[in-house]
Amino acid sequence: MKKAAIWKNLIICLVIVIVLAVFMDPQSPVSMEALDKELLIKGNSGYTIRIIYAEIQHSELRESLDYGVIVSGENERREKSGTWRNEEFGEYRICVDAKVDYCIVLYTESEIQVVNIESNESTASLYEAILKLADDTE
């Protein structure tokens, strides 16, 4: 095989790998860990939101939310985490997978937290579990 053909094939393979890397949907950047009295929502960036069930005063499942602007934290293609500000809440804490529309808004005495996990369905299930756990701690 000629050198030009080898280089051509190499470039084609490289382009295919790059396209796959860009368009493949990797695992969600947000994970959760459920403990007895709290829930941890963790971003790949290392940012963690600690939700203590007994401190939840009110919660809502939203099908969409205007996240606003970042104050500090991450604003990546898939992960939004840290402290953000929008017109509705002012400053609040967030840890979400940006490709998931649904999110859970949690109100405590001291702050507002916005979280979601890998899919709309998983986020809705998590919301139902949080409602039950928050009721059980009252």
PLM features: residue spans?
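Non-transmembrane, membrane-adjacent beta-strand/coil modules in membrane-associated proteins
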Residues: 42-53, 57-109
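Short, structured coil/loop segments at alpha-helix boundaries
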Residues: 4, 44-46, 119, 123
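Terminal and domain-flanking low-complexity segments
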Residues: 60, 98-138
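Conserved beta-hairpin
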Residues: 21-52, 58
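Context-gated lysine
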Residues: 2-3, 8, 37, 42, ...
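N-terminal recruitment modules of adaptor/scaffold proteins
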Residues: 5, 13-14, 35, 102, ...
